[in-house]
From Swiss-Prot:
SUPFAM superfamilies: Ribosomal proteins L15p and L18e. InterPro entries: Ribosomal_uL15, Ribosomal_uL15/eL18, Ribosomal_uL15/eL18_sf, Ribosomal_uL15_bac-type, Ribosomal_uL15_CS. One of its GO terms (biological process) is translation. Keywords: Ribonucleoprotein, Ribosomal protein, RNA-binding, rRNA-binding. It comes from Pseudothermotoga lettingae (strain ATCC BAA-301 / DSM 14385 / NBRC 107922 / TMO). This is Large ribosomal subunit protein uL15. Binds to the 23S rRNA. Residues 31-45 have a biased composition (Basic residues). One of its GO terms (molecular function) is rRNA binding.
Length: 148
């Protein structure tokens, strides 16, 4: 049986730390493996990855495009086809009910009802937004649309 104190790292997997600047006999003395002069020999002499010498950097070569609208709403989407299949006449449908039954993963900024599919029974639908076609389809069969 292997004991915890018997465990050893695989030979060759653990290398000794490189001690630099400890005399010329060590092989890493004087310039500590950095060579002579130049930016990379200095104390904080790193060249950032976005620097490209004298060439115009990529972020300045590419045009400025678009933006993220901070008023954009990310709705959870439900089509009336789903409401037709899963609910019976005169049911009251709320975002919480849709979430509970697993028709949407999360409410996000609200629920939007879209008009894909046919609706034949009246339903009371409460949601944050409706497409025009969905609103028309729900009201045409005698249902109610309520924006919350």
């Amino acid at each position: 049986m292997t004991k915890l104190e018997d465990l050893r790292p695989t030979p060759g997997s653990v290398k000794p730390r490189k001690r630099v600047g400890r005399g010329i006999g060590s092989g890493h003395g004087k310039t500590s493996g950095r060579g002579h002069k130049g930016q990379k020999s200095r104390g904080s002499g790193k060249v950032h990855m976005w620097l490209e010498g004298g060439q115009t950097p990529l972020h300045r070569r590419l045009p400025k495009v678009g933006f993220k609208s901070f008023t954009h709403k990310n709705y959870a989407i439900v089509n009336i086809r789903l409401l037709e299949e899963k609910f019976s006449a005169n049911d009251e449908i709320t975002p919480e009910l849709l979430l509970e039954k697993g028709f949407i993963k999360k409410i996000k900024d609200g629920v939007k009802i879209l008009g894909s599919g046919e609706l034949t029974k009246p339903l009371i639908v409460k949601a944050h937004a409706f497409s025009n076609s969905a609103k028309k389809a729900i009201e045409m069969v005698g249902g109610k649309v309520e924006v919350i």
